[in-house]
Structure formats: structure tokens, C-alpha cells
């Protein structure tokens, strides 16, 4: 079977970026006088974007509390972005064989599709020397 293009997700597919998120979440929570959470909890909460991640952290649960104050969550999301901007790519690592796999696809057009914001995506890709592998990069805030 021949393919014309290879499409990739970023977080959890090419890159293990959970520790960066874990640090940024806990800096956000502690700054708002909320208890910090475990990396395991953060791992279970990722995958639905930053807003949901932050709301889950404020709720302390996978299920966002129906009583969560929108003003508080808005403030927390802004704080998270500030912390994450400092953390993105600091502890992220490529999964095993990613470089080999991308090299094996040299010559084939490759696109990266992620729900991560462009500013964070570009910073992460640059830090991990992945930018040049992709012909097209589509981010969550592009749509």
C-alpha cells in the first residue's frame, strides 16, 4: 500500500511532554493556593486541550466541577499559559524511534496536526529539532 502523505499528532505520539504540563499545572495551582497534584493525575487529564486540563486541575478530578467559578478558571488558564511558556520543551523528550521513523519517511510529505497552540508548538518543535521534518503544521488555534 502506498501513501502520499504522513500525518502525525504531537503530544503523546511523537513527544512525551507531560512533565512540562505537570510543572506548569502545579505552579498555577500553588500560585492560586490550591493543592498540587501528582504527575499521574496530570497524565490522566491531558488530551482535551489546556482549558479542560486547567479546569480538571482546579476541580481535582477528571470530571470538571459544575461549581467551578468561571472567573477563577479564566485566571488560572492565563496563569497556566505564563508558566507553560517558561516550561514548554524543558523536560519533553521524543519517544523511542521517532527520529528513525521520521528519517525513514524522508522525501514523503509530512504534516503535524495538534491541538496545542502554535506558539507552544513551534517552541517545542524547535527545542527538539523537529521543525524541519514537517511540510505543514496545523495547530489548535489555527482554526
Q: Where would I find each of the regions flagged by the language model?
A:
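Substrate-recognition "cap/lid" segment bordering the active-site pocket of phosphatases
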Residues: 90-93, 117-143
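Short alpha-helical
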Residues: 20, 49-52, 100, 119-120
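Alpha-helical substrate-recognition element adjacent to the catalytic core
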Residues: 32-62, 70, 83
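Substrate-recognition element of Asp-dependent hydrolases with the DxDx(T/V) motif
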Residues: 101-125
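Hydrophobic packing residues within well-ordered alpha-helices of enzyme cores
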Residues: 25, 54, 98, 121-125, ...
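Active-site neighborhood of HAD-like aspartate-dependent phosphohydrolases
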Residues: 1-44, 55
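Metal-dependent phosphoesterase signature
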Residues: 57-103
Amino acid at each position: 500500500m502506498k501513501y502520499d502523505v504522513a500525518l502525525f499528532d504531537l503530544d503523546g505520539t511523537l513527544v512525551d511532554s507531560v512533565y512540562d504540563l505537570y510543572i506548569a499545572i502545579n505552579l498555577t495551582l500553588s500560585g492560586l493556593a490550591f493543592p498540587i497534584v501528582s504527575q499521574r493525575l496530570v497524565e490522566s487529564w491531558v488530551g482535551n486541550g489546556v482549558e479542560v486540563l486547567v479546569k480538571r486541575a482546579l476541580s481535582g478530578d477528571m470530571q470538571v466541577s459544575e461549581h467551578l467559578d468561571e472567573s477563577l478558571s479564566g485566571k488560572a488558564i492565563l496563569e497556566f499559559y505564563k508558566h507553560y511558556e517558561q516550561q514548554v520543551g524543558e523536560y519533553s523528550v521524543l519517544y523511542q524511534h521517532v527520529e528513525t521513523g521520521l528519517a525513514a519517511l524522508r522525501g514523503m510529505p509530512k504534516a503535524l496536526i495538534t491541538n496545542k497552540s502554535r506558539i507552544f508548538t513551534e517552541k517545542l518543535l524547535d527545542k527538539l529539532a523537529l521543525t524541519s521534518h514537517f511540510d505543514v503544521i496545523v495547530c489548535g488555534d489555527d482554526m
